[in-house]
Structures are given as C-alpha cells and as structure tokens.
C-alpha cells in the first residue's frame, strides 16, 4: 500500500535534509551573475505571494516558480532508480512531471506564505564548478518574524540559470534528497508503481488547493 505524502511530511523532509549539504569554502570564487539571478527571481516570487487576489497570486507564483526552477529535471531526479519507467513511457513521464510540479508549487505557496512581501538580500556565492554550478547565499526578512537564511544551488545550462535545490536555516540543510527518499520509499512499497504515486500527489494537491487561503 502506498504511504501518502502529507504536506507536513513534505516540508519536514525539506527542512530535515543534511546529507547533501555543501561545506563553505572561504577561497571559492563568487559569481555575480548567479547572485543577480537569485536576487531578482526570489524577490519576484515573494512579491507574487503578497497579491491579495488568490487566483492572481496562484497563477503568478506558479509562472515564476516554473521559470525559476528546473522542474522537469527535478521531477526526474525525484524518482531516482525508477526513472527508466519515465523514459520508457512518454505519457507516464508527462503525467509525473505535471503532478510533481503542481504538488511542489502548491506546497511552497502554502508554507512560504508567511514570507510574502519579504525582503531578499543576497549575501554571497560560491562556485562549485566555475560558471556552471553555484551556491548562492541569501537572507530573507519577512514583514513579521525573524530573518531566515536561505541558500540556492543554481546550475547554468543552455537556457541560463535554474534553481536545482534550496537550503533553509542556519544549518544549511538542503531540500531535495529527503523528499526523493520519501518518494522512493513509496515506490519500493508499491513495486515501482509511479502511477499510484501520481494519483497520491494529485489528491494531496487538490486538498491543498481547496484549503481556504488569504484573499
């Protein structure tokens, strides 16, 4: 039986990741282009969440997130060793990407609402691979509450910079690997049935979308 992914489980996985943390390197070069990319896009995303019109807020936030993050690449990464099933079935691959993207964006919109209208300040960056793989560090100061430290792993491809992972908090714990492990645990339990995982995420996304939101 597939173990459902709750919103709390999703976010606890995001905040709980530590295995992929990248140790700071005081001698690593900075990348001003990647820093500017994060500054402008993170600022725009938080500004979108401040829109009082729920429909416009959701549409604008989704548009920005799909531009900001490499959702297709992240979606494939999330199923790990089960990704050959996606390569073999175009319909399954499309449905999985859509379901994962909708679930992830709905979760971020809900949980990051308290940061809406916050001020983003990029504080530095560290090149892991020169010109291609960069960790950008930032602080987010919400209208209410404490400043939050956020790190962004961005990769440069033919389409420019794209976010691949985010780390939240002073411990610089990353978001991607534990969520992948949770998905893989579900797939292991249901004999690799990606379609069952898709249906689970669709149900969870619908529940989040139907939850009354600020308007």
Language model segments and positions:
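Short beta-strand edge/turn micro-motifs at domain boundaries
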Residues: 147-178
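Surface-exposed, charged secondary-structure patches
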Residues: 96-98, 105-148, 200-215
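Early exported N-terminus immediately downstream of N-terminal targeting peptides
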Residues: 31-112
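N-terminal secretory signal peptides that target proteins for export/translocation
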Residues: 1-3
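Low-complexity, intrinsically disordered terminal/linker segments enriched in charged
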Residues: 166-215
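N-terminal export leaders
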Residues: 5-11
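Boundary at the C-terminal end of the N-terminal hydrophobic targeting segment
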Residues: 26-30
